[in-house]
């Protein structure tokens, strides 16, 4: 069990390389067959109770490795200030553990559907996607690092999402990744070929869907990304210097249609300070519009992480609120307690 556990954890961990920034979907062709063979070896227990528990155990080890490495970056939110070491550890280990609990019903489904060869492939894919659907909707929803996101490695491959969405796309991606398993026996060899064609079919659909020539709008955008440390953003005495830095970076010789600043560029509530918005727009001489990230207070308890569009006279003409906040990074779960 120790060897299988380590092997399963390894398979789950390397699956992250199928997502951005690596975008190597073919790593799944290694990780999923490894995981499948582990499940194949433990499914021989005739008692459904013990078989189900084994599937939940190894399935969660696979996903724990996947979540641990894939969501490790969230813990960096606690690095800007001392005294949060305990919370950092909770975010590193607690979040993957919670997500594993939420997705566990998917492994129960896999255990009940499991069978030899082709049936096992469908059972594994169905179980994982069921778990992903649950974690995408239960509680506040956490639809991050879905296996369906791996189709984003290419403009053509991602077009299939327009038909299936990411959950069903993920179902087919896992079947594609399990193709090598079906090559091991003659009676499933043809299914192995069929599963191997899933990704090329995705690519072909994307090629046919995208126009051969892309017509670009005659618009010019200026995107600004500064390098300002978090401790300066937390220092109220640095607000003026930060604003000057962004205004300096926004200077160009040519007029642009839109200047874009990053999330929380100026560490104040821009939506609450019209005079500051006007001053900023006076400093941006080459554009009439500024798109910038801001925190918006809509009532005493709700603060939204939003993108706001500011016109040349300092008015906010449009806003877009972020739907899913980063746990521990943008909000503290169970903060009431």
Where are these regions (language model features)?
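Soluble catalytic regions of membrane-associated enzymes that act on cell-envelope
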Residues: 206-332
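Short, intrinsically disordered, charge-balanced linker/junction segments flanking boundaries
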Residues: 334-337
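Membrane-embedded alpha-helical bundles of multi-pass enzymes
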Residues: 1-210
